[in-house]
């Protein structure tokens, strides 16, 4: 599983434009084979900063998304006039577990939190 962590700082007066672009792209995400989920968060320490966290089955699905023409157009707009700054991190998920599904939890955690 791949996590894409996209931090963005929209330019002054461009908050709504950023949200419009993100909303227009969301239906396209669901068309990508290998897309799992996406959520958007607003920073508590810097209310101007937004984080988009998406999960993908593999790097091929991320590449398909990255190269989708609508997404390339959004990237161009973002870099051109919507963003003051951004940072993108792409990471491999080592483990994925929760309160009830403990399959991938480390053995020492399973002993304590059974």
Locations of the language-model features?
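Conserved short loop/helix modules at catalytic or binding sites
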Residues: 74
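Short secondary-structure boundary/capping segments
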Residues: 79-80
């Amino acid at each position: 599983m791949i996590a894409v962590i996209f931090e963005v700082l929209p330019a002054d007066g461009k908050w709504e434009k950023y949200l419009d672009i993100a909303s227009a792209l969301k239906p396209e995400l669901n068309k990508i084979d290998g897309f799992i989920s996406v959520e958007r968060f607003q920073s508590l320490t810097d209310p101007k900063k937004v984080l988009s966290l998406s999960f993908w089955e593999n790097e091929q699905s991320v590449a398909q998304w990255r190269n989708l023409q609508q997404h390339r157009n959004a990237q161009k707009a973002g870099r051109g006039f919507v963003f003051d700054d951004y940072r993108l991190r792409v990471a491999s998920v080592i483990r994925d577990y929760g309160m009830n599904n403990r399959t991938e939890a480390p053995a020492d955690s399973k002993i304590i939190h059974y």
